[in-house]
């Protein structure tokens, strides 16, 4: 079983970065690059430098990211948005009207996240919500990356590469190292010790930042039954409900949570590491029991 990411985005560190700044910059960029590659087929190489006179940080379109007075994971993700063209291109300016970003893909994505009346504020070089403009905004970071991807597509600078998750996938749990499966005779998802066939394959569909997981053996989908801790996950025929939709939330190094759209709890083995044990639902955190990665 080999782990992999959807994207190939990388970065190069300026050899002149001061030694007392280097480790913090490397840690921030490692997280931001892994986070981004987990969510989509992003590509390119970011040149990363440091400027003692830079108040916080800045970036140019497909050029460099320069850290200054602010170094951290949030800052790295925020500047990556600028590197991809958000707020740094003429195409961005043409799609900002009356303080809102009006690109159709982005409008569809933000309303999927926040409801039919939602819109993406935009002004100067920045957007909000999910712009990661301040330290108190460092949550739901996956939505920042999702919205940057749609902005790139709206601006005509590339595709919505977060859609690359669609296809046949396998998922491995971090704590058990077992593979997500659905036994045809069972009514719930579980874990297998090894890859043996279609029961560990999942046909992933993607729409507006959310995915569905249909088992390769019988086509049934993973569905949440309730909110809260230790709620059951079940296998059910496709019904189009938000209880069958999941949001990938990167935690680092290619791992991610799968948060249900309806109940907002996450797929979790709840500490039962035995092969065949049911996968259930638990309030989302960073525990290895609820972290997953793609394998092949």
Predicted regions located by residue number:
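Structural recognition of the beta-strand scaffold that forms the well-ordered cores
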Residues: 11, 46-48, 64-67, 82-86, ...
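Zn2+-dependent metallopeptidase catalytic core
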Residues: 17-46
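Catalytic Zn2+-binding segment of zinc metalloproteases
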Residues: 80-97
């Amino acid at each position: 079983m080999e782990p992999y990411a959807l994207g190939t985005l990388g970065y190069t560190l300026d050899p002149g970065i001061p030694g007392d700044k280097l480790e913090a910059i490397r840690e921030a960029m490692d997280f931001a690059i892994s986070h981004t590659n987990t969510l989509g087929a992003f590509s390119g190489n970011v040149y990363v430098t440091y400027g003692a006179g830079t108040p916080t940080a800045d970036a140019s379109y497909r050029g460099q990211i320069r850290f200054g007075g602010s170094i951290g994971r949030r800052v790295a993700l925020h500047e990556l948005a600028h590197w991809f063209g958000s707020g740094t291109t003429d195409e961005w300016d043409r799609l900002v009207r009356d303080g809102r970003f009006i690109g159709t893909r982005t409008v569809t994505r933000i309303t999927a996240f926040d409801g039919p009346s939602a819109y993406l504020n935009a002004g100067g070089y920045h957007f909000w919500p999910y712009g990661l403009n301040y330290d108190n905004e460092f949550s739901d970071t996956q939505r920042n990356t999702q919205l940057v991807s749609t902005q790139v597509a709206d601006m005509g600078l590339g595709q919505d590469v977060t859609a690359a998750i669609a296809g046949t996938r396998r998922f491995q749990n971090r704590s058990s190292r077992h593979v997500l499966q659905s036994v045809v005779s069972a009514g719930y998802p579980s874990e297998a010790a090894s890859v043996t066939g279609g029961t560990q394959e999942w046909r992933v569909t993607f729409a507006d930042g959310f995915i569905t997981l249909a088992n390769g053996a019988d086509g049934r989908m993973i569905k949440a039954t309730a909110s809260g801790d230790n709620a059951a996950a079940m296998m059910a025929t496709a019904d189009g409900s938000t209880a069958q939709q999941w949001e990938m939330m990167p935690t680092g190094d290619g791992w991610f949570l799968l948060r249900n759209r309806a109940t907002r709890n996450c797929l979790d083995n709840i500490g039962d590491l035995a092969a065949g044990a049911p996968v259930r639902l638990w309030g989302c955190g960073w525990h290895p029991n609820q972290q997953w990665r793609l394998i092949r």
